[in-house]
């Protein structure tokens, strides 16, 4: 994998509106990994992509009404079968870590790359974890 203009080449890039400038775009020192599925434990759909693009169809699930006003994104989303989708260029601040603190430094979004794995906390991630190593080597 190669990065050009803060985007991984040869993967899908869907630009989320949910990002802004980093205080220092050269200070990226943390990778934050989360899991997500919408609805929970429901995989292989486009609900997460729609959520990050502010296009979630709230008629699909009652839970979607509760989260429809949230504005979130991640830099990368790795689906269960290994597909990697980028939503925010790496030099920009994705909105993935919320109110956060890492080793005494607050606002992790300022200095981190956010990666979402399609899944739940208690699921197996074999393929996703294999593909997780690819962008970290780029």
Question: What kind of feature is each model-predicted range?
Answer:
Residues 2-23, 30, 35-129:
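Active-site-adjacent loop/helix surface patches within enzyme catalytic domains
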Residues 130-136:
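Conserved small/polar residues in nucleotide/adenosyl-binding loops
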């Amino acid at each position: 994998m190669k990065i050009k203009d803060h985007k991984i080449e040869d993967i899908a890039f869907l630009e989320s509106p949910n990002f802004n400038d980093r205080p220092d775009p050269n200070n990226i020192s943390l990778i934050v990994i989360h899991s997500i599925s919408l609805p929970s434990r429901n995989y292989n759909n486009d609900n997460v992509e729609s959520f990050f693009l502010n296009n979630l169809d709230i008629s699909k699930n009652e839970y979607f009404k509760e989260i429809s006003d949230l504005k979130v994104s991640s830099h990368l989303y790795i689906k269960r079968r290994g597909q990697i989708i980028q939503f925010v260029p790496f030099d920009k601040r994705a909105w993935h870590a919320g109110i956060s603190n890492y080793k005494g430094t607050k606002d992790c979004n300022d200095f981190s790359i956010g990666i979402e794995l399609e899944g739940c906390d208690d699921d197996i991630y074999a393929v996703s974890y294999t593909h997780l190593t690819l962008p970290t080597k780029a």
